[in-house]
Amino acid sequence: MSMSAIERVIPLVGHLPPSIREGLARRMRELAGLGLIALSGLASAALMTWSVQDASLSHATSRPIRNILGYAGAIGADLAMQILGLGAIMLVLTVAVWGWRMMTHRPFDREALRLGSWILCTVIAAGFVSCWPHGGAWPLPTGLGGVVGDALVRAPAVIFGPPGMIYRTVLGVILFAAMAATFLIACGLGAREHDDELAEIEDDDKPLDEDEESDRGSVSLGWLFHALMSTKARLIWLCGAAYRSLVSSGPKTRAVGFSRQEPNLGGGRAAPPISPRSEDEDYEEEHEEEEDEEEEEEPAARAPRKKAAPKAAAKKSSDKFELPSVSVLAAPKAGDRQPLSKAELEANSRALEGVLQDFGVRGEIVKANPGPVVTLYELEPAPGIKSSRVIGLADDIARSMSALSARVAVVPGRNAIGIELPNAHREKVYLRELLVAKETVDTVAKLPLCLGKTIGGDPVIIDLARTPHMLIAGTTGSGKSVAINTMILSLVYRLRPDQCRLIMVDPKMLELSVYDGIPHLLTPVVTDPKKAVVALKWAVREMEERYKNMAKLGVRNIDGYNTRLLELKAKGEEPTRTVHTGFDKETGKAIYEEEKLSLDPLPYIVIIVDEMADLMMVAGKDIEGAVQRLAQMARAAGLHVILATQRPSVDVITGTIKANFPTRIAFQVTSKIDSRTILGEMGAEQLLGQGDMLYMAGGGRISRVHGPFASDDEVEKVVRHLKTQGQPEYLEAVTAEEPTEDEDGGAVFDASGMGADGGGDLFQQAVAIVKRDRKASTSYIQRRLQIGYNRAASLMERMELEGIVGPANHAGKREILVEEEDSHM
């Protein structure tokens, strides 16, 4: 059935979109094929129940009719048997094959040739069966081929004489060959056509699963329902468009309750954006300008380091410190949000139902929840529909709905499956509207982070103090770096430097360098991977120091510690603690002194690492060990870690790191494997990028969030304001390692953190031990200096390079090349 024929039957089809018209044509063709198969089935039933005793045009009787189709079936079957005999079977069989070809979308061209071959095949079939004797069981006076068959057999007898057995056999073979040839032509089963149809058959059958092919009858009913629902959805859309055109001619008013534009998935054209440039272009160009400017700028001169405790930083100016104003941030524009009528949502829902029916998924869209970037359609599946089957159709749903991508997931706690489709008009999420939202203003979070908006447009505010650490992954351009910027701005907009300090590690030297010089920093932005290891080791020591102070006051976390300090300060008491300062040279006994504890509250410390992969390449074991200890123990001490990487592979996000970071954020990734690495399940590869993320809370619950955007200019304005509030009080010990101290964690941190020229005093001690004891082995140096094996091995390699010891022999022993009385350096 051609498209023009359908348009003549249904005038409304000409007004439908091309995708709907094409789908409707396919459904009508399938319905026609189903009708032909049903017609051939009825004809076969009439022929199978034919009886010569039934009433017909050539026989009158009062006996009841035994034909299954009644009087009409008896007359039709009798005519077919009288004229064609058993050759009528070929008449019905060819029609059934035509119906099968139409249902499976195989081509049916050259209709005149098909019909002519069909008639000729039926006549030849009647002659073929008339070649064989019927005996006495045949109730008709004619042969097995009826009147037509007898005429075809007896016609050559005029030339060759009365037909004998040999004549009938030869004629039967010839007629059989002719019947087979005409049958293949009538059915379109020729060799050339078969080869041409293979590709089309594969394309048509590809979206269907194996279990669906066995249920084409029930699926055909779904196709009919789809056609009806699509037509209904189009009518609703046309009525809505006419209504909007009338409303737009009058005074423009904003509809209450609608704040964002949704896609017209029914096939109509989406309204063009008001601004000449789309949000996606603004997002990409502003982010590229940020990277270009930071690459061209020379490293700014860093402020001189001052050795001061972190709790004393910005203490003098804390009372006068002024938090940044939200006025420097961009506000939402009036044209960014476009309402969507309920009629359009209803039309999209019905179109989605039709697509699901195409793939054999029965159910109903019970709710459409529009959001700033995507719309969530909740499908209530029919009994017996597996959720895994619907989830596996995500790519097919996106293709059928003409969407960039589609994400399908089960709605927790409900008998519903969520289908997330992107909006035609993407709304930009602004950081300003999140900072002034009621959820942010009224929050009691210690370290509030503005993550973005949910699918429904609600703000998402989390407390990093309760998280307590975060792992972020995403490819280039997915919005990972912008999300880190918005997290930093969320902290500096709410907390003063005496409440929260920051340690920023940026091996790429691009993303976080703009924050260099703000009062919240404990140290200048760390760009050297080796110094990053030292900074993480300092964080471990700071954590242990805080735990000792908490144990002295009998508290369990940093909030209790600060509260106890305020109570002691109000009472005028000065707490002390016992500190081991050394040993008596004469007696060898340990010396302890009483040290007063400061009454200044301890600030939170947030460690931000922008690119984890670069650090793992330089010092993987050091980083993994330090991050593990911080993630396991630092929560109560007020230290929190945010790790980000653009390469979420197993060699970067190791099992140890993953186990200690229950809170994770996945932006768009390139493959399902990367999504499983960061989240443990698929879905991140179907995100839209540019701030679209999947947020996994500590309990394993995953929700989709659309992150806010902060431009380069906004970040620079906030940084300039912070710099006017005071100079940063840097702590030199953060990046300056003290190698003379014995490290309990020596087995955790290897020698890569001290560098080629670091640890000079420790090296001198190792040389003195070798010259004095005349023993040179890694394990001996490790035991004497109480350090880790990696560091001891590094010291031995350096002594070999400087000619103090020789290379190890086959037994692992080294020759000492310096005399005992010699002094090195």
From Swiss-Prot:
* Sequence positions that bind ATP: 477-482
Q: What does this protein do?
A: Essential cell division protein that coordinates cell division and chromosome segregation. The N-terminus is involved in assembly of the cell-division machinery. The C-terminus functions as a DNA motor that moves dsDNA in an ATP-dependent manner towards the dif recombination site, which is located within the replication terminus region. Translocation stops specifically at Xer-dif sites, where FtsK interacts with the Xer recombinase, allowing activation of chromosome unlinking by recombination. FtsK orienting polar sequences (KOPS) guide the direction of DNA translocation.
Q: Which gene encodes it?
A: ftsK
What SMART domains has UniProt attached to this entry? AAA, Ftsk_gamma
**Record's keyword terms, sorted:** ATP-binding, Cell cycle, Cell division, Cell inner membrane, Cell membrane, Chromosome partition, DNA-binding, Membrane, Nucleotide-binding, Transmembrane, Transmembrane helix
The UniProt entry lists the main location of this chain as membrane
Q: Under which name does UniProt file this protein? A: DNA translocase FtsK
Q: Which organism is it from?
A: Bradyrhizobium diazoefficiens (strain JCM 10833 / BCRC 13528 / IAM 13628 / NBRC 14792 / USDA 110)
Query: How does it associate, per the subunit comment?
Result: Homohexamer. Forms a ring that surrounds DNA.
